[in-house]
UniProtKB/Swiss-Prot annotation:
This is UPF0352 protein APL_0584. It comes from Actinobacillus pleuropneumoniae serotype 5b (strain L20). InterPro entries: UPF0352, YejL_sf. Disulfide bonds: none annotated. Belongs to the UPF0352 family. It holds the Pfam family DUF1414. Transmembrane segments: none annotated. SUPFAM superfamilies: YejL-like.
């Protein structure tokens, strides 16, 4: 999703691969996968971001990045 990242590709690829493997292990359909991932994002924001305004700003940036990654090039 991100065009630039402060994380190494190796670290990102390993984490992404693990998350995908878990969804595949549970044979999670698309809707269940999206629900689980959405809950993870919500929990990450609630547990790690101090203020409601910061959480909303990050959620907006995240949703914009997601939408931009889906645009046909």
């Amino acid at each position: 999703m991100a065009t630039q990242s402060k994380y190494q590709s190796k670290q990102f690829d390993a984490l992404s691969g693990d998350l995908i493997a878990i969804l595949e292990k549970h044979k999670a359909p698309v809707d269940l996968s999206l629900m689980a991932l959405g809950n993870m994002v919500t929990n990450i924001l609630l547990e790690n971001v101090q203020t409601g305004a910061q959480r909303l700003a990050l959620a907006e940036a995240f949703s914009n990045a997601l939408k931009n990654s889906l645009k046909i090039k």
